[in-house]
Design a protein with these regions (language model features):
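A short, active-site helix/loop in glycosyltransferases that binds the activated sugar's phosphate group
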Residues: 261, 266-297
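Membrane-proximal helix-turn-helix segments that form the acceptor-binding/catalytic region
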Residues: 203-209, 243, 252-274
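Short donor-sugar binding/catalytic loops of nucleotide-sugar-dependent glycosyltransferases
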Residues: 325-329, 359, 384
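Short N-terminal targeting/anchoring amphipathic segment
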Residues: 83, 88, 203-223
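Glycosyltransferase donor-sugar binding loop
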Residues: 352-365
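Short beta-strand->alpha-helix junction loop in the catalytic core
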Residues: 242-244, 280-281, 298-311
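Nucleotide-activated donor-binding/catalytic signature segment of Leloir-type glycosyltransferases, i.e.
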Residues: 364-384
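Conserved donor-binding/catalytic core segment of Leloir-type glycosyltransferases
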Residues: 307, 313-332, 341
Length: 388
């Protein structure tokens, strides 16, 4: 039995979906259940292995849609600037280093290579851009070998992506993706797939699913239909990670589902089980399905997170101390919390608020702190291990 967990992307400031998967991975390992975590998005800025390792996943438990049809392993990047220099067929006449970018110039050919490092000060190269006569013509992406190449041509004085080529370990071509704006055609030696939807459907069909396997759909945007159609004979589960409906739009006869779950709920008869994080949400969903749909789905409650043991403070707790730990995203409303603490400070001078996490709202929070001169009692802590 294998449990396949279907997701889209992952980042350095991951959402609760990825943390839920990380908790799930730990539980599966502790109980001896084989599990794979599948990511469907294209990753251009980082190596997927770096992102998943950061969350505690093992490389062997990760499947990337785009590398599945190659023989490449999920692995950290080891390609170096020296490796790149050996492969450049021209005389390198000048070198420039600016932060995470190393540029190698070949003056005679009017070409330069821009190597983007994994980290500033390291020699590890994530990708290389080749610029000829001022025009971007190619990007190469690396892990322990070249994973894939993007090809560009100038259109209206802009670099236009028209093809990606994916490689095997020996450098042979596994398949091509022909790109036309937001549309893609995937060309294999023995078949042509006319869309990413067909690509995902083909991927699902190649997993060799049996009636002993389980597919858990964590995110379905752009993938739901292909997954639903190609899961059987395995069982299909859907995780509800957020509020599943719009309370303001509910009437006696209609309900507005969260758009991220609308497809799954509309096809609930094809889902073997739904998972909610709380018994309250499960109860609400059952009532709503009974009232607004012809379906009576099987819904189970499994809390998202867990701790391996209960930790207690070694000394006395810090009085009047508040913390929050999350992505600093708009929907988390951490700015509301910061403003509330500023207000509370007026009647509770000892209050202290530590904000853990990073994200798009960080600058906004800094502004709130500075405008209210709250630096002494509201602190941005960034990413930290809060286990202990």
């Amino acid at each position: 039995m294998t449990v396949y967990n279907i997701n889209l992307g992952i980042g350095w400031a991951s959402s609760g979906v990825e943390y839920a998967q990380a908790y799930r991975s730990t539980i599966f390992k502790n109980t001896g259940i084989k599990a794979k975590f599948v990511f469907m998005d294209m990753f251009l800025q980082d190596n997927l292995s770096d992102l998943t390792r950061n969350m505690g996943f093992a490389d062997e438990d990760i499947i990337w849609l785009y590398s599945y049809f190659t023989d490449l392993k999920i692995a950290p990047t080891t390609y170096t600037v020296k490796d790149l220099e050996k492969e450049i067929p021209y005389d390198i006449t000048r070198r420039e280093i600016n932060g995470k970018v190393v540029k190698l110039f070949c003056a005679k050919e009017d070409i330069f290579y821009a190597a983007y490092l994994r980290k500033e000060g390291e020699d590890i190269v994530h990708r290389v851009e080749k610029v000829s006569r001022g025009c971007l013509i190619r990007k190469d992406f690396y892990s322990y070998t070249k994973m894939f190449t993007e090809y560009y041509t100038p259109v209206d004085n802009k670099a236009h992506l028209y093809q990606r080529r994916f490689f095997n370990e020996d450098g042979s071509v596994a398949y091509d993706e022909i790109v036309d704006g937001k549309d893609s055609v995937f060309r294999f030696p023995d078949k042509i797939l006319s869309s990413k939807h067909e690509f995902i459907a083909y991927f699902m069909s190649q997993l060799g699913l049996t009636d002993q396997d389980i597919v858990i759909l964590d995110r379905a945007t752009g993938t739901g239909q292909a997954v639903f159609r190609n899961t059987k004979p395995a069982k299909l589960g859907v995780v509800v990670h957020a509020e599943h409906f719009s309370e303001n739009a509910v009437t006696d006869k209609t309900i507005l589902w969260n758009n991220f779950y609308e497809y799954q709920f509309s096809n609930a008869d094809k889902v073997d089980f739904f998972i909610t994080a709380t018994e309250r949400q499960r109860s609400i969903m059952l009532d709503q399905f009974n009232k607004y749909t012809p379906f009576t789905p099987h819904i189970v409650t499994i809390p998202v997170g867990s701790v391996d043991k209960l930790r207690k403070p070694e000394g006395e707790r810090k009085p009047f101390s508040i913390i929050t730990a999350s992505r600093l995203a708009n929907e988390k409303h951490v700015d509301w919390l910061a403003k509330a603490v500023v207000k509370a400070k007026e009647s509770l001078p000892q209050v202290n608020f530590d904000i853990y996490g990073t994200g798009a709202e960080e600058a906004k929070l800094k502004t709130i702190i500075e405008e209210n001169q709250a630096q002494d009692y509201i602190h941005l802590k960034g990413h930290q291990d809060l286990t202990e």
